[in-house]
Amino acid sequence: MNPLIRAARPEDVPTLNAIYGHYVEGCTCTWEEADARLFSREGLARREERYPVLVAEIGGEIRGWGSLSPYNLRSGWRFVAENSVFIDHRFHGKGLGKALLAALLDRARSGGVRKVIARISGDQLASLGLHRAMGYREVGRLREAGFKSGKWLDCVYMERDLGTAQP
């Protein structure tokens, strides 16, 4: 499958939130437990260009999204971003996550980001595998740091060194 990767638009917000909402309700890939509206039209419009939200379209329908966010708001962290990728559960295994993550890494490079961080629940083997395949390496693990769905979860920290930013 060759998805169209493009910047998210305000009218995409309901679909982005619906995709995310599926995982809030039934998955440990996000540790959010309550009904969450990750995006708003206003918030999406105000995002810095350096921290995009991208969507993957197939046949004109959004089937996944990915974003870059500041890893930490303190100024010394300005060269580090965190990525998130969520795929419509009906479209797993079709290369959408890889396409979105590749596009996010390209945008990070062009935006002066030096490292991209991913925080992944230790039981999410597909996500861990995707990030490894895209050149990320595990740099830390917080054991039993989160609790969801009746169980304690590890948080795996992975990084991709882009080595491009200069202060």
Locate each region found by the language model.
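Glycine-rich phosphate/pyrophosphate-binding loop shared by adenosine-nucleotide-utilizing enzymes
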Residues: 3, 61-65, 153
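Conserved beta-strand-loop-alpha-helix junction that forms the acyl-donor binding cleft
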Residues: 92, 118-128
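Conserved GNAT acetyl-CoA-binding A-motif
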Residues: 108-120
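Acetyl-CoA-dependent GNAT
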Residues: 29, 33-90, 101-102, 107, ...
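A short beta-loop-alpha structural element at the N-terminal edge
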Residues: 4-18
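Helix-loop element at the rim of GNAT/NAT acetyltransferase active sites that forms part
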Residues: 17-35
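Conserved acetyl-CoA-binding loop-helix of GNAT-fold acetyltransferases
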Residues: 93-106, 129-133
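Conserved catalytic-core motifs of GNAT/GCN5-like acyltransferases
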Residues: 67-70, 117-120, 132, 137-154, ...
